[in-house]
Amino acid sequence: YPSKPEAPGEDASPEELNRYYASLRHYLNLVTRQRY
């Protein structure tokens, strides 16, 4: 089962935030695909 991506800190750069949201979206896709 995929692990949830770690949230970047308060001082994260925009690149880190974009990478986090992209990985989070990928993680949610994996989780919901396995559920149905």
Curated annotation (Swiss-Prot):
Belongs to the NPY family. InterPro entries: Pancreatic_hormone-like (IPR001955), Pancreatic_hormone-like_CS (IPR020392). Pfam families: Hormone_3. The gene is PYY. It comes from the Eukaryota. The peptide YY form is cleaved at Pro-2 by the prolyl endopeptidase FAP (seprase) activity (in vitro) to generate peptide YY(3-36). Keywords: Amidation, Hormone, Phosphoprotein, Secreted. The keyword Amino-acid biosynthesis does not apply. GO terms for biological process: feeding behavior; neuropeptide signaling pathway. The modification Phosphoserine is found at S13. Gene3D superfamilies: 6.10.250.900. PROSITE patterns: PANCREATIC_HORMONE_1, PANCREATIC_HORMONE_2. Its main location: secreted. It is found in: Secreted. The modification Tyrosine amide is found at Y36. This is Peptide YY. This gut peptide inhibits exocrine pancreatic secretion, has a vasoconstrictory action and inhibitis jejunal and colonic mobility. The lineage of its organism: Eukaryota, Metazoa, Chordata, Craniata, Vertebrata. One of its GO terms (molecular function) is neuropeptide Y receptor binding. The record marks P2, S3 as: Cleavage.
